Structures are given as C-alpha cells and as structure tokens.
C-alpha cells in the first residue's frame, strides 16, 4: 500500500475493466493487491543463462494434460506409460497413502470419490471465499477447505494439499513421460495457462512447475500456443480467432499472423466455464429424472454420484458423433424395495437444450474481443477451435453463426496447446527461428485512491512485457519508510513507482525516491499464495513422492521377475521330472516356498531384496536343469551308439 497520510491512501488493485462495475471487485483482477501484498527484495535479476537440454511444452489442462517436444522443426506429442497422448489431470490418494496420477487415479474414482481430485485447476490461485470456489464446493465429492492463508485447498485422509501441489503431481507425470521418451532428465519447460488467468493464478501455476522440479522458462496463454501450432508452417498473412473451450475455462483471442510474427490483438474469456460445467448440468438432469422416476435422491450418495458423473461425461462425448445415446447404470443404488437401476435414453437435442445457456455464455466475450481488437467478423480469415468441448456440433454451429464462417479443424483440439508450448520452448532455446510471439495482458492494472477513484495505468490487451511509471506523494506516517524513505512533511517525498508486467503476465513493481535516488524492487504477491517456505516444503514432499514412486516401481518389477522365475521353474520341473533327482527337486521346491513367503510380504520388502532372492532361485534352478540336460544328452548318446552298432551288424550280414 502506498499511503499519502492517515486521511489519504492509494492502494494497488487490478480489475477486469471489461466486467460490470458490480463485478469489478479487487479479487476479480490482480486478486486484491494491498499493503500485505508487497514483498521487498534487494534486487531483480533479469539475467538468463543459456538454456541447456530439451525444453518440453506442457498443456496443464483442467480435464486432461498433454506434453510435447520439438524434433527438428516439428513438435511431437508424447505418449504416456499407458500409451495415451493425453493424461487425465486426476490425482488420488488411497487409504494406505499411495498416490495415483492420471488414468490409474481416474479408474478408481468411483470407489474412492472423497480422495480423488479432479478439475483442481479451477481452484488454483483462488481464495476460498471466491463465489466460484463456493459454487464448486457443492459440486465435487472431495473436500475444499480454507487454508491458513485464506486460499482454497483440498483435503484427503486428513492432509491438506494446495491446488499447486495437485498440479505439480500432474506435471511430474508429464515430466516423467518426456524423460522416458528423451532418455535423459527434462528440466526446462514452457507451461500454458488460460489467457484470462490473473496474476495470482499465473504465479500459482509457476509454483506448481517449481514444486514438480521443473524450471519454468515461460508461462504462455493457451490460445496463443494454439495459434503457434496452427500458424508455424503458414506463409500467408491473416487475422485469426482462437476459440478455446476446454475442460474448465473459456478463452477467445484475436491474433494477427504476419511473416512469423504472432501478435495478439485482444483476449477475453471466462475462467469458470468449460466441460466440467457441461458435465455438471447433465448430471443434475440425470439425478432429477432418476428421482422423478424412482423417488430416490442420489445427491447424498457420493459413490453413486461419481458413477453418474462418469456416465454423463461419456454420454456428452458420444453425442458429439451420435444423435442418441443410452445411459445404463445397473445397481446404481437401492432402497427398501430393492436395487435401483438407471436406464435412460438421451438425444443430442435434449443435451443441447440442457447446456444451451453455457454455450451462450461464450458469445459476449467473443464480441468484446472483436471490439477490443477493432476487427469485424469479415476481417477474420480463420477461426481455430481448441479444447475438447469444441467437438460438440452445437458449439461449432454457434462459432459459425458468431464469426460468419465455418471454423477450421486444422489442429487437434486436445494437442494443439501442448504443441504450441513446445514451439515456444524451441524459440526460447534458439532451435526455432523466425518466430516472434507478442502476447497481451488480459486485465487492467491501476491505482485506486481514497474515494474510489480508479486510475488505469496499464490497460487490458496491452502487449507484454510492458511497464508504466507513476509518481505519488508520501506523507509522514507511511509504510514506505520500510524502503528507506526518510520522514518528511506530507507531500514532500515523491516516489516514482514503476509497474512492470513481464512476459509471463506476472506483475513486478519498483519504487524510487526522486529526492534521494534510493530505489527498491518490489515483487507483488497476493495476500494469499504460497510462501517461499511453503514451496520448499512442497518440493521436498514431491521429491519424497518421487522416491516412493521409484521404490514402488522397482518393487513391482522385482515381483514380476520373481513370479516369472517361479512359473518357469515349476513348468520345467514338471516337464523334466523323470530326469531330475528327487532330493534336488525337493530342495528347489523349498526355495520356491521361501520365495512365495517373501512375495506374500512384498509391501514391506525392498525391490533389491526380492530381486536378489529371485536371482538365487534362478541360479539354483539353472544348476538343476543343467544336470537334467546332461543326463538327457548322455542317454541320447547311449541310445545313438547302440543304434549305430546294430546298423553295422546288419550291413555285415547283408555282405555275407
């Protein structure tokens, strides 16, 4: 807070100027920056070292995440351990403390709904009291709680996790996928965020990258990344619109592509509108119909709700290619009369009616973006669709009606953002040349003085990085003394404040006393967010989880090896039982029994112990089978010798 006196104060806030005055609360913009939001640091380091190694591009999505790397001049989307090109952004904790990420976590969600976290990107960088968060608390089976700093966190088995931590676990999975493909460690990354994310949300995403062990070189906007994926190999100049309706957020960006320069003209959106809302709307419809038909209210049964939620998501996807689908969930619940089954037919028209209001919510941001960019729909040469929800025919029709042209399907809506992030990584590493990305800040930054007068310093849709200098007067009772400004009569000291938004869209401030020339760098943080100690502790926890994952993988591989050796040994013992000494067979059977006892307590054993025991069993079995082989070879030689002798006798008799 920069205070003029007891009676006059100026405080830094951000606002989404495109919103209504009633909605333009401080937390809607740069998350209510205040006196507590300043952290003073001695200097700001702008130096950047040469980037070593590959730079991975990661789309950290609400529903699914994707990772890509540059191979030469082309970006390649990588498959995860399950063979899929996208990974569910789902993290679960089992009763025994095991952490699951991706598809394994999603598969067990029905039986463990309270400890399975999904769509936590909608919580990242948000306060618990935000209306959107309060709305989410009623829609998800897991607990959303107020952290000590006032942020929204989640709880599993009595432990609290920040949304940045959950995002970090997903990023670790992406990092592992990249490392498995590259064959070496991947440290550098470009991570994407919704274009309409504010400062707190962007910083929280960077925190997630740091917790996961990544060096986040840049945070870029998802529509901009998709534009890079679309336009990298295009030679013609044109204005394009990127309509990005994903799992949890909606963005619209207008860009001009000209000779390798990607300039964002404007951006707009809604950070709480996406596929999750479509799923929730359909879920409410199904629950309502089920109650009407059976009289049973499913809202109190988390396990049943999770089954319905998964069925709703599946039906939504099917209706993009079919005009009708069946929703069948046998034994969904039961009452005094017995089990209840869900059998429902759903048409595409019915589904479109259920979600029509959600689709309409994307129209106003698109119109505002065109207005801010000073373009008409006739000026737009291409409309790019990004995000899984753009596969819905009604969404595509809405886009066509809005922009007056059929949208392009030139990019994969699930992969384009990760590809664009990888391209930007290539640009930063110097591997991709002749590409320049000029992005914008989505929200305005300004100063509000006593009386509620708001002065914009940096307007929304200003190209970043950017800076603005503003001079304020400081009175004798002011907190600015902490940066070394001596006490003086009111209005005498003049402080030159520089507001700087970097290429990641994150705000920095520097303050300079024009009288003394003394200068201090200020990094703006929201009153919430993660402290340095929080992040360090989370990094340690993430490393602990990574070590546990490594040990678990080692143990599983050792168990698989041991079970294979047992199976092979028993098979060969049965096959060669006539050639094996009985006493040696009994000894080997005892070894197998000991091995099985060890496997029975595998969870308390290390992979190395299991591997050593399995190797000992294998060596013992090989010695025994070697004996059997020699015996069989000897018998064959004996039978072969007698056969040869008989042939010679026969030949001798024929000659006589």
UniProtKB/Swiss-Prot annotation:
A Pfam family per the record: HSP70
Residues where N6-acetyllysine is found: 73, 76, 135, 138, 143, 206, 234, 288, 300, 360, 540, 544, 577, 589, 623
Documented activity regulation: The chaperone activity is regulated by ATP-induced allosteric coupling of the nucleotide-binding (NBD) and substrate-binding (SBD) domains. ATP binding in the NBD leads to a conformational change in the NBD, which is transferred through the interdomain linker (IDL) to the substrate-binding domain (SBD). This elicits a reduced substrate affinity and a faster substrate exchange rate. Upon hydrolysis of ATP to ADP, the protein undergoes a conformational change that increases its affinity for substrate proteins.
Annotated region (Interdomain linker), positions in chain: 432-441
Residue interval of the organelle targeting sequence: 1-46
Keyword Ribonucleoprotein tagged: no
Entry's EC annotation: 3.6.4.10
Domain of life: Eukaryota
Positions of region (Interaction with FXN and ISCU): 432-656
Alphabetized InterPro entries for the sequence: ATPase_NBD, Chaperone_DnaK, Heat_shock_70_CS, HSP70_C_sf, HSP70_peptide-bd_sf, Hsp_70_fam
PTM-bearing positions, type Omega-N-methylarginine: 490
Biased composition (Basic and acidic residues): 646-656
Residue segments, region Disordered: 633-656
Catalysed reaction, written as an equation: ATP + H2O = ADP + phosphate + H(+)
Renumbered residue ranges of the record's region Substrate-binding domain (SBD): 442-656
Broad class of where this protein is predominantly found: mitochondrion
SUPFAM superfamilies assigned: Actin-like ATPase domain, Heat shock protein 70kD (HSP70), peptide-binding domain
Domain free text: The N-terminal nucleotide binding domain (NBD) is responsible for binding and hydrolyzing ATP. The C-terminal substrate-binding domain (SBD) binds to the client/substrate proteins. The two domains are allosterically coupled so that, when ATP is bound to the NBD, the SBD binds relatively weakly to clients. When ADP is bound in the NBD, a conformational change enhances the affinity of the SBD for client proteins.
Quaternary structure (record): Interacts strongly with the intermediate form of FXN and weakly with its mature form. Interacts with HSCB. Associates with the mitochondrial contact site and cristae organizing system (MICOS) complex, composed of at least MICOS10/MIC10, CHCHD3/MIC19, CHCHD6/MIC25, APOOL/MIC27, IMMT/MIC60, APOO/MIC23/MIC26 and QIL1/MIC13. This complex was also known under the names MINOS or MitOS complex. The MICOS complex associates with mitochondrial outer membrane proteins SAMM50, MTX1, MTX2 and DNAJC11, mitochondrial inner membrane protein TMEM11 and with HSPA9.
The family this protein is said to belong to: Belongs to the heat shock protein 70 family.
Function: Mitochondrial chaperone that plays a key role in mitochondrial protein import, folding, and assembly. Plays an essential role in the protein quality control system, the correct folding of proteins, the re-folding of misfolded proteins, and the targeting of proteins for subsequent degradation. These processes are achieved through cycles of ATP binding, ATP hydrolysis, and ADP release, mediated by co-chaperones. In mitochondria, it associates with the TIM (translocase of the inner membrane) protein complex to assist in the import and folding of mitochondrial proteins.
Protein name: Stress-70 protein, mitochondrial
Species per Swiss-Prot/TrEMBL record: Mesocricetus auratus (Golden hamster)
Gene name of the encoded protein: HSPA9
